[in-house]
Amino acid sequence: MELKKSPDGGWGWVIVFVSFLTQFLCYGSPLAVGVLYIEWLDAFGEGKGKTAWVGSLASGVGLLASPVCSLCVSSFGARPVTIFSGFMVAGGLMLSSFAPNIYFLFFSYGIVVGLGCGLLYTATVTITCQYFDDRRGLALGLISTGSSVGLFIYAALQRMLVEFYGLDGCLLIVGALALNILACGSLMRPLQSSDCPLPKKIAPEDLPDKYSIYNEKGKNLEENINILDKSYSSEEKCRITLANGDWKQDSLLHKNPTVTHTKEPETYKKKVAEQTYFCKQLAKRKWQLYKNYCGETVALFKNKVFSALFIAILLFDIGGFPPSLLMEDVARSSNVKEEEFIMPLISIIGIMTAVGKLLLGILADFKWINTLYLYVATLIIMGLALCAIPFAKSYVTLALLSGILGFLTGNWSIFPYVTTKTVGIEKLAHAYGILMFFAGLGNSLGPPIVGWFYDWTQTYDIAFYFSGFCVLLGGFILLLAALPSWDTCNKQLPKPAPTTFLYKVASNV
């Protein structure tokens, strides 16, 4: 069924509002997991590397499972998937309050909540794109701020709930808040259901010939059967012995329900051959699609700038994601007193990320700015800021660095521009899917690696030197790959809107 023309308004603004709320409710706790990370360290007494897996899984699983999430939305629709994801997120959070050990949290918080976030993000983006065309960039920009606002508010909210109700009470209350996703999801009316009449019921015997199992275009059924019989003339392939009484056939194919002859009916023989041929052609078609996909993937990696971009995004997520998870513990390790905290460091990261998305997206719209080099600049500056964290020993310096890192993390808003410049608009979806998979891998690996460095050295200094080195290395690799290709990268290929749905992924602010 074809969708109606996007209304660019009307009920679409309701979709934008509830999508904003769902992302706020869904991503608030996983993105502000750094507050819970400290409590889990005290509650379970595990190492920082092992404990960091909880937050990293919640962030990375949604990206790693993005193909499955897209398939679910395509198969069942945005509204059912949103409601189901609400159950997953709320259930995972509430289940985490009963966790007896850290391994249970890997499943309840890391996998269940993370997968729920991935499903919800895909659903909200899909239905928003259906309702908006001319104003799609604005609509997607509005819903994407839900996660950043959620990070800003939930960082302080979870800290307060832990003080008043303890860790378990905090998770129960946050999980109860997430149940509001179900109410929001119920308002996500599919676009085609607005005024499309329900299909009429048709009796099986009234079905036209076009609903037969297979009918080659331009030929009648008898000609098709002759072609099939030539391919499958062997008696061993086509003969089916009917014995021991009646055999009941599918009422959609034959009106006579039973056959009592011991000799094989000619019509059934033809139908078997027809179905066999159809299945064979379907298998060949699937194999051809798989070969085409692999061929296109190989062709993408022959582009040296794309290969460098793949390395850069992996290294960026390994090194750039840990601060949002570990910054609160960094402050505690630096003996910063809680009385000095004007605002949680994670809240600063969250609000500055929203500002960075907006300003970097505006900069990318200027024709005289090459977005590839703008993205490289954000990587290099972020790498230097990460290397400066070991020298920050006060709340003011940590807050300043948190703001810088948060602003630069907003480079997700220009990442689709970079991908478009590298591979072209026609290959954007394929290339972006590959890049996001490895971004999820980096998100999952980064915090545990930094935590392991702390367990090994009992200080975050080497850990953040390593993080900064990773991001710097990715930036310089991308810069070196792009410099000789300035002419090809500087061509003004068609650009998506600066806030298009591709820039934000299931686990990033």
Swiss-Prot record:
InterPro entries: MCT9, MFS, MFS_dom, MFS_trans_sf, Proton-linked_MCT. It is found in: Cell membrane. One of its GO terms (cellular component) is plasma membrane. GO terms for biological process: carboxylic acid transmembrane transport; carnitine transmembrane transport; creatine transmembrane transport; urate metabolic process. It catalyses: creatine(in) = creatine(out); (R)-carnitine(in) = (R)-carnitine(out). Keywords: Cell membrane, Membrane, Symport, Transmembrane, Transmembrane helix, Transport. It holds the Pfam family MFS_1. Residues 1-12, 483-509 are cytoplasmic. 4-guanidinobutyrate and guanidinoethyl sulfonate inhibit the transport activity. One of its GO terms (molecular function) is creatine transmembrane transporter activity. It is a multi-pass membrane protein. Its main location: membrane. The chain crosses the membrane at residues 13-33, 53-73, 80-100, 102-122, 137-157, 164-184, 305-325, 342-362, 372-392, 398-418, 433-453, 462-482. Extracellular pH-and Na(+)-sensitive low-affinity creatine transporter. Also functions as a pH-independent carnitine efflux transporter. Belongs to the major facilitator superfamily. Monocarboxylate porter (TC 2.A.1.13) family. This is Monocarboxylate transporter 9. It comes from Homo sapiens.
